[in-house]
């Protein structure tokens, strides 16, 4: 992530009213903040994040306003003064220890404020001190200000600052800020009411992390790491959260990206470089260079599974990536792959996959117009990319499955779980608990036991029937067993282990002596739940837990103890035999 504001970048502007405005900073433009005013965008380009600015009216400026950076001492001056005044102050208390000074006798209505609405509006037009003069006038004209407690006065001052102070803080736009902004201001239904804490829990239980950097030879020789299969109906929010955890969400800085880009290319040693420099330019050096083929990342990638012709990843535009016009320098250009359900289940029915464009010789290509030649290369590259992504996805061996969809989760897991590698994590989000409880029942221990017993019965029946037919193939018998099992069971419950349901919600509280309670203004909505399980590879052999039969029992040797004579004076009864 960049450390300062760059041109054409989306940033988050935190206003005094606690409202977050997401704005694209375009050069030579004006940013409007509603009642808080406006300012030129050029005045914050190149400045670091987390600075608080104050909008001042300045007639000398072209736009009529300028910005002033508020230092930390001034920003927290009110808090420091309030803490200093409260030190050593002793309040009068009653017999039970409660403070005598309360707000019960205060009637906070319009009659307590001498300033009228017309006078306040006139002060807004005349004052250029970013709202400080209005707040001071309101405090001077308040009749019951001296009767307020320190806590009530602090809340009153906070409300007036949020209403009249012309300040804003520039924050870098990350997934957490975007999630809270979508939940509070842009409609939570667009992201399935996925809260910030649930986004973190989804990535945690899905074991989403960076797969590590590996060279091309190592990736070919071994299995690539960090390959995740995603079903996202939140507009790309889940994909953005995963990419942030994997380190492929934000565009590279200019200098750093050039260094990383040059490291990916094969470097020549000093002798070869010197030899190339000494060679004079030849006629072949002016020949048209070969068009580079599109290379996709083999590891540390995200494969999005979607039901439409194109996936809905509109929220990725806030992080510099557009699906319609992708930037080739963005990390997601190589690490993000898309595949439809049709291409996964029946790829031959998709014309993009099955119909290969006509191959045109190079000699004929040079005679074509540039627009036709470019269209030909785009079709060939698109077909090659679709072929590669579909074949790679159908081969499976993914390291994790993340699902946040409005479809039935069981229908998604029926076809997606077999594509996972062993020990891969599965995390499914749902706003309500009912779809996930049904999913937990499908993968429960009782269903596993019934599935295994029924499979064993079918195999025994097939073996008895095939005893009369010695030419019967064993693989055909197994396929017939699976077909009959899938008719009775919706999915294979032996593919996932330890299904659990998770829930988490952050609730803000007001913490005061005797007045501690959750904030009444907190947002409601769906709780949100997560289903988690681990992919296992079931064995094809019958397992019988009979214990260790080779272990021998230990023999207990009893020794006879000699009897001793009993004294008559010991008080012990002795049986006398004649």
From Swiss-Prot:
GO terms for molecular function: RNA binding. One of its GO terms (biological process) is tRNA methylation. Residues 253-306, 459-478, 558-578 are annotated as: Disordered. GO terms for cellular component: nucleus; tRNA (m1A) methyltransferase complex. Pfam families: Gcd10p (PF04189). It comes from the Eukaryota. Its main location: nucleus. Residues 264-278 have a biased composition (Basic and acidic residues). Keywords: Nucleus, RNA-binding, tRNA processing. Substrate-binding subunit of tRNA (adenine-N(1)-)-methyltransferase, which catalyzes the formation of N(1)-methyladenine at position 58 (m1A58) in initiator methionyl-tRNA. Belongs to the TRM6/GCD10 family. Heterotetramer; composed of two copies of TRM6 and two copies of TRM61. This is tRNA (adenine(58)-N(1))-methyltransferase non-catalytic subunit trm6. It comes from Aspergillus oryzae (strain ATCC 42149 / RIB 40).
């Amino acid at each position: 992530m960049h450390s300062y504001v760059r041109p054409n970048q989306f940033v988050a502007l935190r206003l005094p009213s606690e409202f977050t405005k997401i704005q694209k900073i375009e050069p030579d433009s004006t940013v409007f903040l509603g009642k808080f005013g406006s300012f030129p965008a050029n005045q914050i380009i190149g400045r670091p994040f987390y600075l608080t600015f104050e909008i001042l009216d300045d007639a000398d400026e072209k736009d009529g306003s300028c910005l002033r950076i508020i230092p930390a001492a001034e920003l927290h001056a009110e808090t420091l003064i309030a803490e200093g005044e409260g030190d050593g102050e002793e309040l009068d208390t009653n017999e039970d220890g409660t403070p005598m000074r309360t707000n019960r006798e205060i009637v906070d209505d319009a009659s307590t404020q001498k300033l009228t609405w017309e006078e306040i509006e006139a002060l807004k037009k005349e004052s250029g001190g970013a709202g400080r003069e209005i707040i001071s006038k309101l405090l001077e004209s308040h009749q019951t200000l001296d009767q307020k407690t320190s806590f009530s006065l602090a809340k009153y001052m906070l409300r007036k600052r949020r209403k009249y102070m012309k300040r804003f803080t520039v924050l870098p736009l990350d997934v957490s800020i975007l999630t809270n902004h979508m939940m509070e201001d842009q409609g939570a239904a667009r992201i399935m009411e996925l809260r910030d804490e649930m986004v973190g829990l989804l990535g945690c239980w899905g074991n989403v992390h960076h797969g590590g950097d590996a060279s091309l030879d190592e990736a070919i020789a071994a299995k690539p790491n960090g390959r995740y299969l995603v079903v996202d109906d939140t507009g790309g929010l889940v994909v953005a959260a995963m990419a942030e955890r994997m380190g492929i969400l934000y565009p590279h800085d200019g200098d750093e990206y050039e260094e990383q880009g040059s490291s990916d290319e094969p470097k020549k040693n000093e002798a070869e470089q010197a030899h190339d420099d000494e060679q004079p330019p030849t006629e072949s050096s002016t020949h048209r260079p070969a068009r580079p083929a599109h290379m996709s990342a083999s590891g540390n990638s995200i494969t999005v599974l979607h039901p439409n012709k194109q996936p809905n990843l509109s929220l990725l535009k806030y992080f510099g990536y557009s699906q319609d016009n992708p930037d080739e320098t963005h990390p997601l250009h190589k690490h993000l792959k898309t595949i439809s359900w049709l291409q996964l289940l029946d790829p031959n029915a998709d014309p993009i996959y099955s119909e290969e464009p006509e191959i045109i010789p190079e000699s004929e290509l040079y005679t074509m117009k540039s627009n036709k030649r470019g269209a030909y290369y785009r079709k060939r590259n698109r077909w090659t990319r679709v072929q590669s992504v579909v074949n790679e996805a159908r081969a499976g061996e993914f390291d994790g499955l993340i699902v946040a969809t409005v479809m039935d989760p069981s229908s998604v897991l029926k076809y997606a779980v077999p594509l996972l590698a062993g020990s891969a994590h599965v995390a499914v989000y749902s706003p309500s608990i009912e779809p996930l409880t049904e999913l937990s029942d499908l993968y429960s221990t009782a269903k596993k036991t019934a599935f295994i017993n029924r499979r064993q019965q079918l195999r025994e029946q097939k073996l008895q029937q095939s005893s009369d037919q010695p030419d019967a193939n064993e693989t055909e018998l197994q396929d017939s067993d699976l077909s009959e099992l899938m008719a009775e069971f919706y999915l294979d419950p032996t593919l996932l282990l330890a299904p659990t349901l998770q829930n988490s919600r952050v609730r803000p509280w007001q913490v005061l002596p005797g007045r501690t309670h959750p904030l009444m203004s907190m947002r409601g909505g769906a709780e949100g739940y997560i289903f988690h399980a681990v992919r296992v590879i079931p064995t094809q052999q019958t397992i019988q837990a009979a214990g260790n039969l080779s272990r021998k029992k230990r023999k207990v040797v009893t020794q006879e103890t000699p009897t001793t004579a009993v004294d008559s004076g010991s008080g012990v009864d002795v049986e006398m035999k004649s």
